[in-house]
From Swiss-Prot:
Signal peptide: none annotated. Its EC number is 3.6.4.12. Keywords: ATP-binding, Cell cycle, DNA replication, DNA-binding, Helicase, Hydrolase, Metal-binding, Nucleotide-binding, Nucleus, Zinc, Zinc-finger. It is found in: Nucleus. One of its GO terms (molecular function) is single-stranded DNA helicase activity. This is DNA replication licensing factor MCM2. InterPro entries: MCM (IPR031327), MCM2 (IPR008045), MCM_CS (IPR018525), MCM_dom (IPR001208), MCM_lid (IPR041562), MCM_N (IPR027925), MCM_OB (IPR033762), NA-bd_OB-fold (IPR012340). Component of the minichromosome maintenance (MCM) complex, a heterotetramer composed of MCM2, MCM3, MCM4, MCM5, MCM6 and MCM7. PANTHER family: DNA REPLICATION LICENSING FACTOR MCM FAMILY MEMBER, DNA REPLICATION LICENSING FACTOR MCM2.
Amino acid sequence: MDDSENNAPSTPGSPGFSTDRLPPNTTTSRGATDPSSYSDDDDDDVVGAEEAEVDPNVLPEDDGVVAAEEEEDGEDLFNDNYLDDYRRMDEQDQYESVGLDDSIEDERNLDEIMADRRAAEAELDARDVRTGAAPDRKLPRMLHDQDTDEDMSFRRPKRHRANFRPPREPRTPRSDDDGDGATPSSPGRSQRGMYSGGDVPMTDQTDDDPYEDEFDEEDEMNMYRVQGTLREWVTRDEVRRFIAKKFKEFLLTYVNPKNEQGEFEYVRLINEMVLANKCSLEIDYKQFIYIHPNIAIWLADAPQSVIEVMEEVAKNVVFDLHKNYRNIHQKIYVRITNLPVYDQIRNIRQIHLNTMIRIGGVVTRRSGVFPQLQQVKYDCSKCGTVLGPFFQNSYTEVKVGSCPECQSKGPFTINVEQTIYRNYQKLTLQESPGIVPAGRLPRYKEVILLNDLIDCARPGEEIEVTGIYTNNFDLSLNTKNGFPVFATVVEANYVAKKQDLFSAYKLTDEDKAEIEKLAKDPRIGERIVKSIAPSIYGHEDIKTAIALAMFGGQEKNVKGKHRLRGDINVLLLGDPGTAKSQFLKYVEKTGHRAVYTTGKGASAVGLTAAVHKDPVTREWTLEGGALVLADRGICLIDEFDKMNDQDRVSIHEAMEQQSISISKAGIVTSLQARCSVIAAANPIGGRYDSSKTFTQNVELTDPIISRFDVLCVVKDIVDPFTDEMLARFVVDSHARSQPKGANLEDRVPTDVEDDPLAAARQADPDILSQDMLKKYITYAKLNVFPKIHDADLDKISHVYAELRRESSHGQGVPIAVRHIESIIRMSEAHARMHLRSYVSQEDVDMAIRVLLDSFISTQKFGVQKALQKNFRKYMTYKKDYNELLLLLLRTLVKDVLHFEEIVSGPTTRLTHIEVKVEDLKNKAQEYEIYDLRPFFSSAHFRDNNFVLDEGRGIIRHPLAA
């Protein structure tokens, strides 16, 4: 036949299709192979069993004549109606446009397109005839894959069988002399033939469990040998089945070594999850990596694909154990906990992209909940056909090219009824205040919450996020920077809320044993007070107040309706240079979650909360301020008096109700601000005037003053003895803290210089290290919740009545009902300091003493003496009598020095001062102190350069030259 006459169409449905063009021998669509190329052994390998069953029926003995005719004329493969199967059906002779370039509009109609296509295929057929190529390359695949007994050339090759082999079917044996036409599959790996693993969904491969497959030892070893990149390796079908098999074994067979009963850990967790009606199964990464270390590493480095398999397995396991649970939840989510590697937000780099990370911080902003497309269907606006479903994820965007029915290119509208959505929310996670390096701004990272993780955290809460660090395209960044920049986000897989907010500071068993041992010391309260800022001399009242504030009282919630705060607020008011700011800095370094700010540097919204418009969603969002960030911690405000009145009023609610109500831009909500407030302020004019009341010395209103539990007044009084001790303390501190390399021969030992507090501890071994003090406070707040007895309330009521009576006569700070609660909070804090479960009489007396010291210090100088005399029985409780006797002795020394100055003139010729012991005894008896021998042998007496002369009955004190 001439080439010009060879116009037979390639499709059997075309007119003029001739059966004579069907080849006698065909194999696969990739080329023609003579059946003789297959060896007998190869044929026996593949279909030997089938031939054994069929051969006796091929040529039956009774029909020998018919068989002879068929042997002579050949078998008629086509009956009279075979052409009906290939009749022309134009409505089905259409092809999808997926993957085609649709940028060029084709103006031809369907008939013209099909005519041109037939002409092109006829030309290809003519070329095949000229070149001697296989004339059967365009035959339908259904004709190639027929397993007939008469014509072995239509048998499906083994490599095509491998793709569709059921997982439970054993591997077909293969002889050593297989031909080229039957390439076997390598152990444990499927060959990519007609369909790849990504083209055929795993759930459709078999009616049984799609992840059930048999892997021998060699197969498992091959699975662990990663070929190519890890992300491509874990997407292979055989690797996914291997991961699924191992994870299913882990879920059903893992036994926690700590479980004495030996029950299956995750079967129990699945039952608890179902009982709680949840859809998230938490997998401990440390347990998983102990059983399957390689797969656990794959999970950390390529989490997207591995978690997808794990969630499918978890869903099957849960639904197998609980048949009806699929009616409640359609999907089970796998949450990875205890990821061992913890990264700071500022240390995340591009190497972490598309890996699983664990970060922590404070939630500063939270968006609303949005519906995100998960499984979308479209309606063709021209023919009404429903297209889809299309699966949408965070990495790809679904675009429909054309309608397969009418070939229209749109427009397409989302079918709202059949489209499936999922919840979507965005958080802004900022570094915790305590870990930000000095002089640096805190970094932040966007966190995406999906499905049941919605609303798991609110602004101000400290959380840990385990998720996938990924990137997304942000057009605004490209416009801003002028070159392609991708925004990075963390897709949360697991969110752990730090309920106690102290979990960042881990306590070992040795630490707990040492803390319990310290708590048995009857002087532990005094030791803790001494350990507060030991580099600052004196100020025992401030140190006591700060210690009580750091331990805190017990929060109360009356029947879930009325909440009483347990945090203690402290105000430090005093002259400049009295170490107020240094106290705040010490608390910032010692407290677990302390936020430091200044009155001038913080506005009202900077302290409470601000409302911002989200640049992406264009909706208003809340961003917490300093008080919100310090939730369950301490907020330190320096220069409190420099704040504007409007800014100061904004923290009234935060200090008492410990919440911040917001009604801005249509947002009406409340944020948590459960923190202690320790503020420092300077008096009016720079110096505190004792002839004026407290309110006259500071620009603060009564509502804000009454919210402070303790008011500490610090006055810079000229006292030769106190000044001398202070100067000596400062000089010794500097001498012991010389920089490295200076005066090497005079330097102190290394163990002293490495720790700034070592010098102070050398002078006083009772001082605890800052690290141990942190651990002690953490342990106390986690494990001790003291309760108060009814008997103690009577004494508190009596003291309150007396204070109310005295405050009505004076002009100091008025006593209100809040001060009763202050006494209770401080007594609970003192009990917690001693790790006691109940408040004792000792704790109540200490709280009353601190409150009285605070109240009396705010009065005028003339009123203070009368109040000290009236409340002496409360104020002398648990006071260090050595300190009191030292104060009395110094007063006597000053009186003698003043007398000598009047009588003899200038005192430069005096070398020492002598005080009679009898005078000191008389002074001590006024305070009900009768035994002076412990004082004479104490360090207070000796360190202040006092010498006792028992023979003469005098106390000698040398004067500085």
